[in-house]
Amino acid sequence: VAAHLRREQRTPHARLRRGTLDFDLAERAVYWQDTPLKLTKGEYAICEYLAMHPGQTFSKEQLYEAAFGYDGEADASAVTEHIKNIRAKLRPAGESPIETVWGVGYKWKNG
């Protein structure tokens, strides 16, 4: 519910730029050199959440809950698969901005 309310409060065409990637928060889309990257809803939600909190490390459970809106203890392993897919889809934009923090989770690299 909270995630839905945050989406509703966004202004149209709110944008976020991280490196060479542009996030259209209203359309829930990621662009690289004006080319849309095809992310699933879950991939986009995880990617956006990390990008909005650069440098902050999140556990798989935290990312699952942020992306899907409920406790993800049983399904947190799905985050690993989503991260793998996100990295593959962001590969044309260069080195992955998502860093694995071993034993903890993932974070969006600063810079």
Q: Where in the sequence are the language-model features?
A:
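A structural micro-motif at secondary-structure boundaries
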Residues: 17-44, 101, 107-111
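G2-box/ATP-lid motif of Bergerat-fold
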Residues: 95
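DNA-recognition element of transcription regulators
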Residues: 2-3, 38-48, 60, 73-92, ...
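Basic, amphipathic DNA-recognition helix from helix-turn-helix-like DNA-binding domains
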Residues: 1-17
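Short amphipathic alpha-helical/adjacent loop interface patches that line ligand
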Residues: 1, 25, 67, 83
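Short helix-capping/hinge SLiMs at alpha-helix to coil transitions
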Residues: 52-55, 70
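Short coil-to-helix segment of the ABC ATPase nucleotide-binding domain corresponding to the Q-loop/switch region
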Residues: 56-67
